[in-house]
């Protein structure tokens, strides 16, 4: 439609698990992983499970612990389920509707697919119009639904879901890290530039895990194997139990992951592209101290993502590090709240100054970045 406008939803979290041994409660594992990824999106969340090829799920607006009550999580628990996907979503105001929550489940003539997406397509409006002209009916306003339609259309025309995904990648522009679950396969997909992170882990009893960040692997007891390469399709096949890679779109020279992942988005205990997020932020603080040395009495950081850089600044400069703010742990990340008014109201109760640390002192205040200046 002519007045359609896509919201930005760069910071989402995706997760997928294939339990080869059949010993995991995959719904509970997805819940734990989404809890670990909650910092990446607080608008909505969802989990889908695969019970011998039958995919069912639940998604809604709200935080993970709000949406997945014991009763809801219990309804997804199934000893025969061997795969699960999960998603936490961030989006700006105007798109806070349940239809945009993920995983999106699509049922078609060749089976069922559940899809989770982190990223933002730059040609989504064009692709949506093309699909609408072909008769597609959209239920939400997200570019994720566009990806679902394209893969489904190609799946009906082609032999395998892997071929359908590869064909879809030919027309997608922008950022996308996907976790896709079919009847017998769990698939991870990363765009050829590698804008958004996506990693692979292994389960102790056999099986594989895909996630936006390695902290989600830790939450389910998985071991980090490697990152999904830019442009790579990684398939965990339940029929063979094997992991295989499709590299038709790998090799683009201009790969470039969003720097904000290391600066702000990711949790400091995550490992991305082989580097510790915590150490990367500390190193940024050290560089800042080298480039902008000052005389001061104390270095403080803005919780939470500014603390690591502040520690690095202190270590490099020799200026003592202090706790200058106390953060209310029940207030989420103000950057990913929908309106500026919401952000301003939240920050008043989010942070409180520790006066004994800063009163009468020369203070170096370190934050990870300035987006809106709200903090």
Where are these regions (language model features)?
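Conserved short alpha-helical segments that host acidic/polar catalytic motifs at enzyme active sites
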Residues: 1-230, 235-238, 242-296, 302
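A glycine-rich phosphate-binding loop feature that marks nucleotide/adenosyl-phosphate handling sites
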Residues: 50-53, 183-185, 301-309, 316, ...
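Hydrophobic transmembrane alpha-helix bundles
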Residues: 81-86, 184, 214, 218-219, ...
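Secondary-structure transition/capping motifs at alpha-helix termini
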Residues: 136, 157-158, 293-297, 315-322, ...
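Amphipathic alpha-helical
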Residues: 146-159, 311, 315-333
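Active-site lining segments that contact anionic ligands and/or coordinate catalytic metals
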Residues: 175-176, 195, 205, 230-231, ...
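Extended, hydrophobic alpha-helical segments in both membrane/secreted and soluble proteins
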Residues: 299, 306-313, 317, 321, ...
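Short, glycine/charge-rich flexible loops or terminal/linker lids adjacent to PRPP-binding catalytic cores
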Residues: 318-364, 374
